[in-house]
Amino acid sequence: MSQSLFSQPLNVINVGIAMFSDDLKKQHVEVTQLDWTPPGQGNMQVVQALDNIADSPLADKIAAANQQALERIIQSHPVLIGFDQAINVVPGMTPKTILHAGPPITWEKMCGAMKGAVTGALVFEGLAKDLDEATELAASGEITFSPCHEHDCVGSMAGVTSASMFMHIVKNKTYGNIAYTNMSEQMAKILRMVANDQSVIDRLNWMRDVQGPMLRDAMKIIGEIDLRLMLAQALHMGDECHNRNNAGTTLLIQALTPGIIQAGYSVEQQREVFEFVASSDYFSGPTWMAMCKAAMDAAHGIEYSTVVTTMARNGVEFGLRVSGLPGQWFTGPAQQVIGPMFAGYKPEDSGLDIGDSAITETYGIGGFAMATAPAIVALVGGTVEEAIDFSRQMREITLGENPNVTIPLLGFMGVPSAIDITRVGSSGILPVINTAIAHKDAGVGMIGAGIVHPPFACFEKAILGWCERYGV
């Protein structure tokens, strides 16, 4: 046996430290490095906590709570019911409130990119005459800063949301809760991508004065649009509905058009809106975010549950919220997004991971559904095989599949749903997120897209926090 082993080429599988496989590669030995980490990433306090949860007398209650959370996600039926200005509909919004993406953060601790979006919003609202005055106002303490997620909202990239901005209004028909998000400015040099010059302000003014009222009045005629059904259709047409929205945008504007042409606006204004929608496939991106938010909020606040209901980033920290731990954020450092850069930019130009758009992955689409959108690898990098494998791998850290939203390429498997902090902690597999990359400095905009994962520290804190809360 030993003679046979050494008389043929070796094909080695290495588990653990990569230095061993690296050394074999230098010797021209075929080697496969197994992507594996120990439970709790080797932190014995986390390993003990995971064991305590698994062996807890509360095990039956945990299982029942998690089943309820999964069912609430699956049974949620979000529909678009309207558009209106944030001051009219968003809980807690005031003329001097600025909502932002991610977990809570103060002006002093915000990254430069988010500060740029905030100052742009203050100029747009007429609270400052220019960016310098806006910076002084933001630092004065007169402005209230708060996470979108704590106001039933989500916000793409910087997520900056102010009183005059028009919002999607999405109702969960099953459970009655409502979620909001602002409208797409389309792509590249825009406020959510932390650009803030006069062209950005002019576009926001037009959205407030023309597009917003037109879509508001159109929805009064239409009544409601079934977003869960539309999402399922978009995934079957090649979108993953986070960074690829070709089909979703077509379906959404198709549904809105009858209301638009009956709403009494001039042909010229209608033309402007249709041209704006046609300028970028991202028009439906925020719509899916609000849809996912409506579903995930329905699963939040279930005692004993270990299901993740929020993943969000503010450019400094990545934050999680867990169903059974309402009112708490578990944070770790925001990561650098890895992926192709636009011409003229390099990785060191990029800001850290930012935005509430990871609510899509929390629900089970976006990075979790990349097998529906193999063409997305041209934007975010990687291979088609890797995109497909992401969808398979995410099933290992979730409690089930959503039969309402399926992946044709994987035998119409439902998208992986209900991320479980204990499964992440035990397996070492982190949720995959595909996302845009904003420049680290204000005023530039989007410079690429790629793949990112939460820091394990978020899950570590959540696991330990759960044990502390429930005395395990």
Where do the PLM segments sit?
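Anaerobic metallocofactor- and corrinoid-dependent redox/one-carbon enzyme cores
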Residues: 2-472
